């Protein structure tokens, strides 16, 4: 089994490159349209990628949803996925989207500690 291949899902998704081109544009448009209810680049730790975005609904939040981005721990960051907060935010939920140090710079154990710290900061 080629482990590199096992982590490259895009090769198995028809027209995957289209998503990779559209999503950053959609994410940026969502951040811009959300205005003051988009709290961007909030720090949760000392490392460069220890930041999260928080998207708030109108009025009091029903709760907090946290979206930990994919990329098999070695690519992407929070800014790639912002538009995926639209549904929960429209239904009254706050949404936190953390970035974290990527592999191979960080091991999975460090990444999970960083995600836990982001959860604590956002809660």
Locations of regions flagged by a protein language model:
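Short beta-strand element of the alpha/beta-hydrolase
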Residues: 62-71
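Gly/Ser/Thr-rich helix-start
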Residues: 46, 71-72
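N-terminal cap/lid segment of alpha/beta-hydrolase-fold proteins
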Residues: 3-60
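Short histidine/acidic/glycine/proline-rich micro-motifs that form metal-
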Residues: 13, 72, 102
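Catalytic nucleophile-loop/oxyanion-hole region of alpha/beta-hydrolase
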Residues: 76-85, 96-123
